[in-house]
Amino acid sequence: MNDVSKASLPKAIFLMGPTASGKTALAIALRKVLPVELISVDSALIYRGMDIGTAKPNADELKAAPHRLLDIRDPSQAYSAADFRRDALAQMAEITAAGRIPLLVGGTMLYFKALLEGLSPLPSADPEVRSRIEQQAAELGWEALHQQLQKIDPVAAARIHPNDPQRLSRALEVFFISGKTLTELTQTSGDALPYQVHQFAIAPASRELLHQRIELRFHQMLASGFEAEVRALFARGDLHTDLPSIRCVGYRQMWSYIEGEISYDEMVYRGVCATRQLAKRQMTWLRGWEGVRWLDSENPDRARKEVLQVVGAIAD
């Protein structure tokens, strides 16, 4: 697409970043001064009843700046990147038709990629192949399968944690079915996003600062009643650790504590470590992201002004 035709497209803003980087606060501040409507891009915030551990915006924040695509699934339900793309495009069209600008905010980079580039023609799931992978995992462990993926598709392996069996088995399954790696196939995208997108990423200047923010927020969640929230989910009886919702960072570790598998202190340690690992994967995505402008989360006022400098002209 040439620059002239691209300039004629409706405008959209991406505000991306690792967990605990201040994305939500910046998005809310921007909504006060720009004609934008917020769309959440977060695979955990979609779930009802999962508020504290996901750092979901509170009632006052949502009143000041409503977020779309929050609380749209029960924790027992699945939600894919394809589901997100469909829902986000519908919301973006509605916002644009009302003469406003969609501001998509979150840290689920796979969703941003699916929205921006379209979805790749990946092979359908094969129960027989998946069963063989799971049998191999039972015999050798998921760490061994992750090492196998590193040899087959090092790019995908860098983004998939060894403790994420769903994504790990899918990456291997795609290769065994098609003979092509997940990375190869995802480079062949579907329909690109029909918007002129201004992309921003917000993060602290150093990894140490991000780690401090992560640890502080995890302890704030605990003080706010995170354990009671997960106990309520546990008491339902229909949820388990094979579900994407319960595998969310923090929830998986608290679940293990409630089941008596680990101590409270171990839960806290693992929860903080898992959140740091998530942030590392998010930063890996973002460092390779084209066309993104970086903002410093330690200076939110300056970050807001930098966005306004770029976006102010398109909002007039």
UniProtKB/Swiss-Prot annotation:
Pfam families: IPPT. GO terms for biological process: tRNA modification. Transmembrane segments: none annotated. Substrate binds at T19, A20, S21, G22, K23, T24. The keyword ATP-binding applies. Belongs to the IPP transferase family. It is an enzyme of class 2 (transferase). Residues 42-45, 166-170, 247-252 are annotated as: Interaction with substrate tRNA. It comes from Salmonella agona (strain SL483). It catalyses: adenosine(37) in tRNA + dimethylallyl diphosphate = N(6)-dimethylallyladenosine(37) in tRNA + diphosphate. Its EC number is 2.5.1.75. Catalyzes the transfer of a dimethylallyl group onto the adenine at position 37 in tRNAs that read codons beginning with uridine, leading to the formation of N6-(dimethylallyl)adenosine (i(6)A). It comes from the Bacteria. ATP binds at G17, P18, T19, A20, S21, G22, K23, T24. NCBIfam families: miaA (TIGR00174). Keywords: ATP-binding, Magnesium, Nucleotide-binding, Transferase, tRNA processing. The keyword tRNA processing applies. InterPro entries: Dimethylallyltransferase, IPT, P-loop_NTPase. The record marks T108, R130 as: Interaction with substrate tRNA. GO terms for molecular function: ATP binding; tRNA dimethylallyltransferase activity. Its cofactor is Mg(2+). Monomer. This is tRNA dimethylallyltransferase. The gene is miaA.
